[in-house]
């Protein structure tokens, strides 16, 4: 049964989560009710659950949208004195605008130039217009014979045609030009002469040729057996009574058998084989020292 209390501090009961208890209700689960205040039943708090974080990429909850993450950077260091700017120390002409210089027109007074003397020009009587052929009329062709030109000395600096040494085109001499066909005449080959002694010519049996089965497909080989022996005469063949099948124990289980050896003398010594060195303190069995 539940217990009633008039404590002003609300307490959580052990009723199922999600049920709200009002004033005047007393459940049978051990609920503690405050006087005049409704409380929730006892249950686990928010800090009991360990849910994956939604911030960042490490151990991030893949079923949720990632929350915004920010990084705090340390304060940048102050710039050294040599990197500081000079500040507003530049002089800008106020008359210079983005359209050009804006100022009133100014004029300059120069000195008087030197006077030039009268030029020497021909007068009207120096011309003869009647001697000038009409410019607008067609005139017949006119030719002029000049004097004989002086003969130029012979230029001997240029080489003669036979002074050039061009590479021949016979054979593959110049790789950029097609070569002319060239032929080579070889001398007559001497006839083959037999050796002085015909016995010095090696015969077919003197060549050491490997077995053809080592580097080619093996040839079929056959073996001929010898003549079989004549069967044993009937009088030498053992009969059924010559065999003793009851004495054969190879294919049967048999009792263990032991052999008794001879008695050895106690004074007789046996040759012991070479044994590895034994550690210190090790004693042979049967000996006291």
UniProtKB/Swiss-Prot annotation:
Does this UniProt record's set of keywords contain Repeat? Answer: yes
Q: Where is the composition biased (Basic residues)?
A: 280-289
Recorded superkingdom: Eukaryota
Q: Name one Pfam family in it.
A: SHIPPO-rpt
Going by the UniProt record, its keywords in alphabetical order are:
Repeat
Please give an example of a GO cellular component term from this record: cytoskeleton
Q: Where is this region: Disordered?
A: 108-136, 181-211, 265-289
Which spans of this chain does UniProt mark as STPGR repeats? 122-148, 202-227, 238-263
Similarity comment: family membership: Belongs to the CIMAP family.
Query: What protein is this chain from?
Result: Protein CIMAP1D
This chain's source organism reads Homo sapiens
Gene encoding this chain? Answer: CIMAP1D
């Amino acid at each position: 049964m539940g217990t009633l209390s008039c404590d002003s501090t609300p307490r959580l009961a052990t009723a199922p989560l999600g049920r709200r208890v009002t004033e005047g209700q007393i459940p049978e689960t051990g609920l503690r009710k405050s006087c005049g205040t409704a409380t929730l039943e006892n249950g686990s708090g928010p800090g009991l659950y360990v849910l994956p974080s939604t911030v960042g990429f490490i151990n991030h909850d893949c079923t949720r949208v990632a929350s915004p993450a920010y990084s705090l950077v340390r304060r940048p260091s102050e710039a050294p004195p040599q990197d500081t700017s000079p500040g507003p120390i530049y002089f800008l002409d106020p008359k210079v605008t983005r359209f050009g210089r804006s100022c009133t027109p100014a004029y300059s007074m120069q000195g008087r130039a030197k006077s030039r003397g009268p030029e020497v020009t021909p007068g009207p009587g120096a011309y003869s217009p009647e001697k000038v052929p009409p410019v607008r009329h067609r005139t017949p062709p006119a030719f002029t014979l000049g004097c004989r030109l002086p003969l130029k000395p012979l230029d001997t600096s240029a080489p003669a045609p036979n002074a050039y040494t061009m590479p021949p085109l016979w054979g593959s001499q110049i790789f950029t030009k097609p070569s002319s066909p060239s032929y080579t005449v070889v001398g007559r080959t001497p006839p083959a002469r037999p050796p002085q002694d015909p016995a010095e010519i090696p015969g077919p049996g003197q060549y050491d040729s490997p077995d053809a089965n080592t580097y080619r497909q093996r040839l079929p080989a056959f073996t001929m057996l010898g003549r079989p022996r004549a069967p044993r005469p009937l009088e030498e063949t053992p009969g059924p009574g010559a065999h003793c099948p009851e004495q054969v124990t190879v294919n049967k289980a048999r009792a263990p058998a032991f052999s008794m050896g001879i008695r050895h003398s106690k004074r007789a010594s046996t040759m012991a084989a070479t044994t590895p060195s034994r550690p210190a303190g090790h004693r042979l069995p049967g000996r006291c020292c």
